[in-house]
């Protein structure tokens, strides 16, 4: 449908008026033979009833329509039109070709996006702001989040159940292998290979770490701290066969000779940067696995590995 003629300043050339809606042409198209021009929406609707020109009744179809000449487009673009939002207080009069850009920024546009400044920060059309209720919106947001959290908790529980079943299957398999090892001693090597590969897979899944404050090492962690680190090891996928050994090796009483006392640690501190360390997820702690630190002397590593806990200074590389 065309633009209302009363919105324009001055007289509008009759050649720019749509014969169907009697408004100023909007998205104009032209019949090629008779050269009559119409709004695109108007003529499309007309053709749904009959395939003729509304003015002279000559045969015309949608396929025949063409854009109007440039001179007509230029005449239309120069027309001065009042803003669509005049009824809402906008007094702007702009060129027709600038109307859309003006509408997108017009402060009187009732559909212009605005942000609630009462606390919830919701973006909404301007005309909805007077009836907006922050509490109602936030309640809806909380409900959506609670629903999402419930879905995630359900998924997490399912994954934990699957993981527990897999771990149980692995333990049963290991128990089976130990049971038949007496029948075939060669299975000892097979079991050791499987466990070693399992350890390597876990170690490779951890993020490499750098310790920036070796002086913050906690060499005598209490039972509570050890339990926290053990839980993180288990959650990271640490093989059950070495979890307890690693936690035992978190205390200086189980450390190798080069780390056994404060004095020896100070003497050997220059070697610390040579350690290949992996971060225990979410903790200020690292594991120094023997399989990754064969370049270190026997007095600096321990089978299957060391757990070093720090007050601060552990960074992922």
From Swiss-Prot:
GO terms for cellular component: cytosol; endoplasmic reticulum tubular network; perinuclear region of cytoplasm. Interacts with USP8, ERBB3, PRKN and BIRC6. Interacts with CSF2RB, EPOR, IL3RA, MYD88 and TBK1. Interacts with CLEC16A. The keyword Zinc-finger applies. It comes from the Eukaryota. It is an enzyme of class 2 (transferase). Transmembrane segments: none annotated. One of its GO terms (biological process) is regulation of myeloid cell differentiation. This is E3 ubiquitin-protein ligase NRDP1. Its EC number is 2.3.2.27. Keywords: Apoptosis, Autophagy, Metal-binding, Transferase, Ubl conjugation, Ubl conjugation pathway, Zinc, Zinc-finger. The gene is RNF41. It catalyses: S-ubiquitinyl-[E2 ubiquitin-conjugating enzyme]-L-cysteine + [acceptor protein]-L-lysine = [E2 ubiquitin-conjugating enzyme]-L-cysteine + N(6)-ubiquitinyl-[acceptor protein]-L-lysine. Autoubiquitinated. Autoubiquitination leads to proteasomal degradation. Deubiquitinated by USP8 to get stabilized which induces apoptosis. A zinc finger (RING-type) spans 18-57. The keyword Metal-binding applies. InterPro entries: NRDP1, NRDP1_C, Znf_RING, Znf_RING/FYVE/PHD, Znf_RING_CS, Znf_SIAH.
């Amino acid at each position: 449908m065309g633009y209302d003629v009363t919105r324009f300043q001055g007289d509008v050339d009759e050649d720019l008026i749509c014969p169907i809606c009697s408004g100023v042409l909007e998205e104009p198209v032209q019949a090629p033979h008779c050269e009559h021009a119409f709004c695109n929406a108007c003529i499309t609707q007309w053709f749904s009833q009959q395939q003729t020109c509304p003015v002279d009744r000559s045969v015309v179809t949608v396929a025949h329509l063409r854009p109007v000449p440039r001179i007509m487009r230029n005449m239309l673009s120069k027309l001065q039109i009042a803003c669509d939002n005049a009824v809402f207080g906008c007094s702007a009069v702009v060129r027709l070709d600038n109307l859309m850009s003006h509408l997108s920024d017009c402060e009187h546009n009732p559909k212009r996006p605005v942000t609630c400044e009462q606390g919830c920060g919701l973006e909404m059309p301007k005309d909805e702001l007077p009836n907006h209720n922050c509490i109602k919106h936030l309640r809806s947001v909380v409900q959506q989040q609670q629903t999402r959290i419930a879905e995630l908790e359900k998924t997490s529980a399912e994954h934990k159940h699957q993981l527990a079943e897999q771990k149980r299957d692995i333990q049963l398999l290991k128990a089976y292998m130990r049971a038949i090892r007496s029948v075939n001693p060669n299975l000892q090597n097979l079991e050791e290979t499987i466990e070693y590969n399992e350890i390597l897979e876990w170690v490779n899944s951890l993020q490499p770490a750098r310790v920036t404050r070796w002086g913050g090492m906690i060499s005598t962690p209490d039972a509570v701290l050890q339990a926290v680190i053990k839980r993180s090891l288990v959650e990271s996928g640490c093989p059950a066969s070495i979890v307890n050994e690693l936690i035992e090796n978190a205390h200086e009483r189980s450390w190798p000779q080069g780390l056994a006392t404060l004095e020896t640690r100070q003497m050997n501190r220059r070697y610390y940067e040579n350690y290949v360390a992996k971060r225990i997820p979410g903790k200020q702690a690292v594991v120094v696995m023997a399989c990754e630190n064969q370049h270190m002397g026997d007095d600096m590593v321990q089978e299957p590995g060391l757990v070093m806990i720090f007050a601060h200074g552990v960074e992922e590389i």
